[in-house]
Structures are given as structure tokens and as C-alpha cells.
């Protein structure tokens, strides 16, 4: 059917109304109420569905800003960041780069000496290591690299952090200096919120940014897909999240439940033609549908990584 593959809130709203029986059945819901149901479904989609988030990285330069260096607070507002999972090791407290620029060979020599390599602290080469086919000892090499990582974590630990998704601020605490680069692994929402998709048209002019964002910038922040629109024209922003089967089903179940709650206020009332209002049945049907969809959503959650140790 034409229009069954929605790419924005308006198209999904029309799909939900048709699913609930419109226009044959009068659905007692306003467009804003349906948009609220869609947004609630998208929020769960982003939190649990494997396609709900995009993995990316954010880079912060401490510079010589005294306040930023002392407080360690970085603003992520407008970046659509859902979570920050870790800080990557760069020149922060690097053992081999004591000042972040010059490389000192003492630690490399120390490891080579432990391995018995000429030129290091040892005087003779008594062990081979590396991925070659002639007496290679890859396990020994792995031990050395693991030991180096452990030394880095002990002597120059990665800073601790706390990200508050409510106010979109990142607090970095611990081992970092001025002029450091802090790179964090972040997860951003892969969809544009309903209010941003619906509310970018006003009057009879064009609103919204006209800049052409790159593909990577649109990946890191889906809001960059928003462009100017002219009143009366269909939106040219396409969002696959609105065409996700689970989102469509759950948003419809929420709309059915809300419609049932509204009709239940007149439960049992006889309408012209002998029709009786039964909002309780809609509420019960929606409850069962929501439970089944929530169980399905938990199964769609990405699995935990495999830990080897």
C-alpha cells in the first residue's frame, strides 16, 4: 500500500490512524497525542534496539582554558549523545611520551631488555618473539604488551568520567593536563526526535539550516539531516526509524491504549444506531500487545561482548 512505509512522524501518524480503523472508525485522538505515542516508542527503540544508537567518538581539546582544566566539564548539548562508555588512551599520561610530544626510549629499552634483545638492557638475544614462522613466541610477546598496558594503567591511569544524559554534560576527573586531547567513545541516537521533525515549518518561508553536512557528521548527529522546508511541501528528510516494524507496532499500541482511556470515560454509553462504547476492551488489547512487544524488544537488545581472560 502506498504510504505504508513512513519516513517521518506525519506519515507514521497516518499509518497509525489507518491501523486503528480511521476514517471508518472515529479515533478520538489529536495529532499531538499521536506524536507523543510515536516519541515514546522511539525512546524505547533507542534504548534497547540494536539499530537505535550509532557508535562514534567525540574529541575535546583542553587547551589553556583554566576553567576547563580545573573543572573538567565539557558541554555536549545538541550532540544527541545517549551515553559515553570510555575514554581512549592518547597522549594522556603516556609513559612513552612523557610530555605528549617527545618520545623517550627508556621504556622500550626496558621491555627489550626483559626479552633479552641486543640493544636493550640485556646483552644477548636468547628469545625470539613476533609473528614469524621460525621459533616465534607470540605468547611471550603478548605477555610483554600486556605488561606494558598494566604499567600504563598503574603509573598513568586513564581519567575517570561521568556523563549526565539529562543535561548533556561530561565531567572528566583525574589524570589530564593542559593541551591534552581527550577522546571519548560515545553512542548517539540514530533518529531525529518527533518534535524536531514536526516543528521545523512556520509561516510561508523556509526555516532550518541550509548547510550541507557531511555523511560522517550526519552519522554522529542525526539532527544534521534536518534542512529547510517550504510550507505546503512534503518533508525531504527521511528517517528509517519511523519505518521500523517494532516502532510502528508499539506506537500503534500506545495510541490504542490512549484512545481506550478516553473512551472509557463514557463506558457503556449507547450511541445512535445501538453502538455501545467499550474503552476497556481497547485498553486490555493494548496492554497485551505492549507486553508482547516489550518482550520482543528485550530480545533485540545487542548481546554483551565475549570476555576472554
UniProtKB/Swiss-Prot annotation:
UniProt keywords, alphabetically: Virion
High-level lineage: Viruses, Duplodnaviria, Heunggongvirae, Uroviricota, Caudoviricetes
Subcellular locations according to the entry: Virion
Name of the protein: Neck protein gp13
Job of this protein: Plays a role in the association of the virion head and tail after packaging of viral DNA within the head. Together with gp14, forms a neck at the portal vertex of the head to be ready for the tail attachment.
Subunit field text: Gp13 and gp14 form a hetero-oligomer complex with a stoichiometry of 10:5.
Source domain of life: Viruses
Predominant subcellular localization, coarse grouping: virion
GO cellular component terms attached to this protein's record: virion component
Organism: Enterobacteria phage T4 (Bacteriophage T4)
